[in-house]
Amino acid sequence: MSKKQTKDKANGAKATKTIALNKRARHEYHLEERYEAGLALQGWEVKAIRAGRANIVDGYAYVRSGEIYLIGAQITPLIQASTHTVPVERRDRKLLLHRAEIDKVLTRVEREGYTLVPTALYWSSNKVKLEIALAKGKQNHDKRDAAKDRDWQRDKQRVMRRHNRDA
């Protein structure tokens, strides 16, 4: 190990590596609070995630009997997946959060009409973590406004670059 890596670990820095992002969530929802949750995975799922075979775009989280589960997320098994279990790509996966966080999320989802959307899947010190966000759906006019604003920002940057280059 190099000196730099040793120094980073001594300072308590956590190495994170993104596995999958849900960019569609930012487009379709107003994202508010974000939470980091662990995932209860089987062995073949961890190997498949290491190989980069995870997709969280179609996934969402819901509360069932006081626990939060991720459904719709796809982890495609490797060809040499486990022989003693049948791999299911889109099974319900339990999310690991503190009880206080679960209770807080539960009240927001049930009373205020929020949805739990996965936004990122990443490694955090050899553990797979999922970032979930409390979200409210956007209307079509909100999406159009966001697109107009994005185009305006791009045009503004283009004009500023051209102006600075000419000056």
Swiss-Prot record:
Pfam families referenced in this protein's UniProt entry, alphabetically: SmpB
GO biological process terms, semicolon-separated: trans-translation
GO MF, any single term: RNA binding
UniProt keywords, alphabetically: Cytoplasm, RNA-binding
The keyword Glycosyltransferase appears for this protein: no
Family matches, as PROSITE patterns: SSRP
Name of the molecule in the record: SsrA-binding protein
Record organism: Xanthomonas euvesicatoria pv. vesicatoria (strain 85-10)
Lineage: Bacteria, Pseudomonadati, Pseudomonadota, Gammaproteobacteria, Lysobacterales
